[in-house]
Regions:
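N-terminal secretory signal peptides that target proteins for export/translocation
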Residues: 1-6
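Ubiquitous "structural anchor" signal
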Residues: 22-23, 47, 51, 113, ...
């Protein structure tokens, strides 16, 4: 009986067909998972006296956590073609809405623009909303408008004006992002 099952062409065809279906299903699941986990970040950025240029990334890191008893949302982006980076940390994010940087309240939101992530020891690479400009004015601001927030996905818009320790200004404008947690 065992020999007849092994030599039966219908059994062999069914086994091959099952194998092909399994491989196709597995590969389609991999493709859809890869597309789902990818997000995007696109905006215009300028540092100091440089003209603004596009910052684009399809690798957006978003994380929801708890810090000091409140919900924290962290967004980290590094440009696909340059070492420029954006770091945003928002406190008390529980629903979509508009969040200001640094904001008011017990916890100040964070918005940093980084000119070159590879030169992390140089202070002048870090542009922060909390630093003063070259005239001594603390004019750094930011706004994050979250238009979609679910347990698995976030989408929104972002602008940041920040200064480095020398007082030079950087701007991120017209930025849009979408990512999975």
């Amino acid at each position: 009986m065992k020999n007849t099952l092994k030599n039966n062409p219908i059994v062999i065809i069914c086994a091959l067909l099952l194998s092909v279906i399994t491989v196709i299903t597995y590969s389609k699941n991999l493709d859809s998972t890869d597309k789902i986990s990818r997000g995007y970040f696109a905006g215009k950025i300028s540092f100091g006296d440089s003209t603004n240029h596009k910052l684009y990334s399809d690798k957006v890191q978003v994380k929801k956590s708890s810090e000091r008893g409140v919900t924290v949302l962290t967004i980290v982006v590094t440009d696909n073609n340059t070492p420029e980076s954006v770091f945003v940390k928002l406190y008390n994010v529980t629903d979509k809405g508009t969040f200001f940087i640094p904001g008011e309240g017990d916890f100040q939101n964070v918005g940093n623009l980084i000119k070159d992530v590879n030169m992390f020891r140089e202070q002048n690479n870090f542009y922060q909303t909390t630093l003063a400009n070259d005239e001594g004015l603390k004019n750094g601001v930011g706004r994050v408008n979250i238009i979609k927030l679910t347990d698995s996905e976030i989408e929104g818009e972002l602008i940041i004006i920040a200064n480095n320790s020398e007082g030079k200004q950087a701007q991120l404008e017209s930025a849009r992002f979408k990512a999975k947690f």
